Amino acid sequence: MPPLRLPTGTQVVARIPVKDQSGVDRATGSVGVVVAVDDLPDSTYLVQDPDGGEPRYSRSDLIVRAEAQWAPPATVQNLWDRVILSSVIGSRAYGLATDASDTDRRGAYLAPAPLDWSLRGAPEQLQDDVRQACFWEVKKLLTLALKANPNALECLYSPLVEHTTPPGEELLAIRSSFLSKVVYATYNGYALSQFKKMDADRRMRGEVNWKHAMHLLRALMAGIVALREGHLPLDVGAHREQLLAIRRGEIAWSDVESWRLSLHREFDRAVADTRLPDRPDYQAAETFLISARLRAASELLGDNGA
């Protein structure tokens, strides 16, 4: 997978030596800030160095400084190529997208063995704010999914999978292992606390974050289905128009609150009747992680001719 586009303001490290606009040499490892990006398919980046020099680089010649601090350039440059799963989540996966909606991507990458074994370890995530993309290192994604983190579970259950590799397919194959009664604590508990906060803001300032209210109701419905049916639905289906009306502020707060309370009661019944286990399948996650690490190690041995 190619490196994602960098926004202006990103601190970067140069992978190659170049000359700036004045003909001054800029060494490998030079640190600067992206000040401009052209819109051509093969984007070039204008980077301002601390002394004011402004060399140009291609995307492949730059490393995000936060990532470079974790590992040497020769290793970091390949991390974007190690994405094993990329899924669209958010409004587009929920069936709630409007013309103004972003396309949010989440997924995982598999760190190369030398980076995973190093003292610094691999970065927990690769992030691109321009494209609204975040790829967790495999272990981090597994940890989040075992805790029933909504973003992690949604990237595993999204109907909009843009990219997978064999390890990514193996990860999707065990996604049901992460569903358990923990979903109730995470989804129901978060919605309850957030609605209390929104109600307090409404009383004090007369303001309601209608978009947030819409997504909390959607999450409650998804969690209920997960407990009842053993899978996590993302698309809201027949509830689309009602949820979008809430987002537009066209539904009275009292009606939103009534729906929310009804969903909490439904969630309580669902967790009492669910066939899901009390805890997720840690062994399945462990087995997958070990397999993924062995795969990364075998790549290293193969590269070394072993």
Model region roles, listed by residue range:
Residues W70-L79, L85:
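Short, Gly/Pro- and small/polar-rich lid/capping loops
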Residues Q283-A306:
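Short, amphipathic C-terminal "tail helix"
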Residues S30, I84, S101:
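Short beta-strand or tight-loop elements
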Residues H163-F288:
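Conserved nucleotidyltransferase catalytic core and NTase-mimicking acidic/glycine-rich helix/loop elements
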Residues D116-F195:
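A basic- and aromatic-enriched beta-loop-alpha substructure that forms the phosphate/nucleotide-
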